[in-house]
A protein has these predicted regions:
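An extended, acidic
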Residues: 2-134
């Protein structure tokens, strides 16, 4: 992971498809954190590798509906890659991703990946913006 002085220097990685993550909520979170750089938008879960290698700093996959459950195969490898690079991956509530309950992350809501030292600040901003949606 890239070493940054704080979240104001961070770059988001996000999905190209608005149906995969709430771009509006993500923009509100960026504003709350003081992030002004344009997001790196890409398809696939290569976003995890992008974060791990330092091409981005924060990956948010924000729920677009309460009923949607992420698939474990979309996130298991990325979770490991980011952790091994020194980052942290949780859901939008700050809970670790639970890969033990079947094919989906049914105990989780969304995904947040960020450097360990900045992850808590990102989670607080996510909770503030999402409120009852999370």
């Amino acid at each position: 992971m890239r070493k940054i002085g704080g979240l104001k220097e961070a770059t988001f990685c996000e999905s190209v498809e608005a149906g995969h993550s709430s771009h509006g909520d993500q923009a509100d979170i960026a504003k709350k954190l003081g992030i002004t750089k344009p997001s790196v938008r890409m398809d696939s879960q290569a976003k995890y590798a992008s974060i791990a290698r330092g091409a981005g700093d924060v990956y948010l996959r924000l729920p677009t509906s309460k009923s949607y459950q992420e698939k474990i195969w979309d996130h298991a490898a990325g979770d490991l890659i980011v952790k091994e690079a020194g980052g942290m991956v949780t859901d939008v509530r700050g809970d670790k991703l639970d890969f033990s309950v079947g094919r989906t992350l049914q105990n989780n809501s969304g995904v947040v990946a960020a450097p360990k030292e900045l992850h808590g600040e990102v989670i607080e901003a996510v909770k503030s913006v999402l409120g009852a949606k999370a």
